Amino acid sequence: MKEKMNLTALEKSWILYDVGNSAFILLVSTLIPIYFNSLATAAGVHEDLYLSYWGYAGSLATVLVALLGPVCGTLADRKMKKTFFLLALLLGAAGCAALGLAPGWFSFLGIFILARVGYSSSLVFYDSMLPEISKDARMDKVSSLGYAFGYIGSVIPFIVCLILVLMPGTFGLTQGSAMVIAFLITAAWWIGCTVPLLRRYHQTAFVTAQNSRLLDSFRQLGKTLREVKKEKHIFVYLLSFFFFIDGVYTIIDMATAYGAALGLDTTGLLLALLLTQFVAFPFSILFGRLSARYDTGLLIKVSIACYTGIVVFAVFLVSQWQFWLLAVLVGMFQGGIQALSRSYLGKIIPPERSGEFFGLMDVFGKGASFMGLTLVAVVSQLTAGAQLHIFGLTLKNENIAVSSLIVLFAIGFVLFCKADKLNRERIAK
């Protein structure tokens, strides 16, 4: 028990990177969509199209990341993992800092896409470090602590940014200049939290390659796909991950845009999503502790089922207090399902090929995110102006679009049950 409670310096440094990059993703979930809406409004973009354009930008970013996933995964298994991790980090942080320089909504989306690509690419290298940094018995806890402290730690720079944005006049700033400073603060926090990991991490597991041509990365992806099809327990798990994480990522990426499209109060939306971070912190730790007592597969099943219920609730969301309740519910399961999904894969793959398989996981995850974001964006655009009257409520086109996520969670649940059964049978042998 003592080993489980005490983290090594390297594990702490690894967790700290989650604290850094989570500040960016919190900004993506809160202030960035609202700032984009203001730029779009100034350019005369119709309000019914906000959610669609934001969704399309997120979809394009995930397509680019999915294409880069095989390259990042292959590079992560070679000796220069830390170097490529640093390059991805710098792309993401520089993109974050440059968001305030965008002259209009279209260029803003372009810079955002680059920042998102850097962020997501860095996670391939970061996640692949886990099997080297922690033992199998500790992976669930370390992974969960990464998300937990990421949620609570990211609140520190966010509160500073929120004060600047909500009260710019107090500091002699305009709304625009306050946002520029918020982007710079977040980028600096992200880089600062990464320094300990860059200093302490030294790659110990890698494969030797004869050359480093980029095309070999895609050939390796094809080889990995052929091999993983033979490893049915991994393949079915990745398929299930493709569907259920789709819903999770889509909810994270579009929560603020969804609330804003429904006409909810901006300040209330930001404070509600700040509440999500505080709720996610203890519940992420709780899931890490529960994984020591209960099967990881069972906890993932419970999380998927609860997320399905959350989406059903979101479909009928029409008021501010309901959004606050939604924020609490999401916070309860968001960190747990992400952390356990990461550590679940880490347990069923060979450590020396962690980069390869986590790169493949990233392709599946980002491909899913593309599907979810695009699905919501398309349905929202096709039903623009439509209203549905049910149970005495008037649901807008945004409510209708969100309902599409229910199917994805349902498919993910069925496939994960199959994958978990295969892994149990494999362990039993």
Language-model features: locations:
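Helix-loop boundary and gating motifs at the non-cytosolic
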Residues: 5-62, 233-272
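A membrane-interface helix-boundary motif in multi-pass transporters
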Residues: 47-48, 165-188, 378-409
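Structural signature of the two symmetry-related core transmembrane helices
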Residues: 83-98, 298-313
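Helix-loop junctions at membrane interfaces in 12-TM secondary transporters
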Residues: 100-112, 315-327
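Glycine-rich segments within core transmembrane alpha-helices of 12-TM secondary carriers
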Residues: 143-165, 364-373
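Multi-pass alpha-helical transporter architecture, strongest
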Residues: 189-200, 402-429
